[in-house]
Amino acid sequence: MKSNPTSKAVLASAMGLALIVVAAGAVSAQEAGAVKSMAVPIPTELPPGELGKVVALGRDIVNNTSTHPLSRQYVGNSLNCTSCHLDGGTNPKALSFLGVASAYPTFAPREKQTITLEDRNLNCFMRSMNGVRPPNGSEVSVAIATYITWLSEGYPVKMSLKGPFGPNSQPSLKIDPATADAAHGKTLYASTCVSCHGSDGAGVGKFPPVWGPKSYNSGAGLSQNLKLATVLKNTMPLGNPNLSDKDALDIAAYVNAQPRPRFVLREHLGKSK
């Protein structure tokens, strides 16, 4: 099966406002000392044969999660994996997938247990995608994990002792979340974000919704102001990130103060395979 690369507009939709999704999330300032970007080339040539077809399928699902015939049944909003993991997860500063497979299995504080890469991917469907968890071992699950593993070629295997963070994770902003000013964030949103994401947060064209019924739910990582602010600082405005730490935090506080689906775990677990 050949991949169906998304247009730049679709990739641009990856505002980084949308969910946290797979293991390449932001880390704390303390953790950042041990997490440095690695100069490993991004793979471009697919493996031969059936394996390459699965990698291509995973890439297609990552770029078109909400509409792909295999994954759309598990998605409850209008977001795609690439809405947060820019450029199909290949942007090293935007919740990158690069090298992520090398950090698993790892202990996940949120789940209070050791999880695999597959577990981490599937949990994102429940939170960032406001959908249901695909079964372990399903075609969707295997394809996404295979794609991320392909993007991890060349990275040494080193299980993360700090949680589900890949080697290109960006450090959390060194700012007190309690200083967030949502009123100031509203002003900044109107001048900086509204042209792509709309005054109602529903997204414009191919740009993703950042609040409302089609955005991430309250259980997503980016529903936490500091995590969202870190993503905004590194990626927004798209193509020219220039926000100060405080402005990023204020925008995050405003966005997360708006209505969004409430996360109730039992409603998102799905069925076992």
PLM regions: where:
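Post-cleavage N-terminal segment of exported redox proteins
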Residues: 2-67, 106-182, 258
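An amphipathic alpha-helix signature
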Residues: 114-122, 141, 145, 222-233, ...
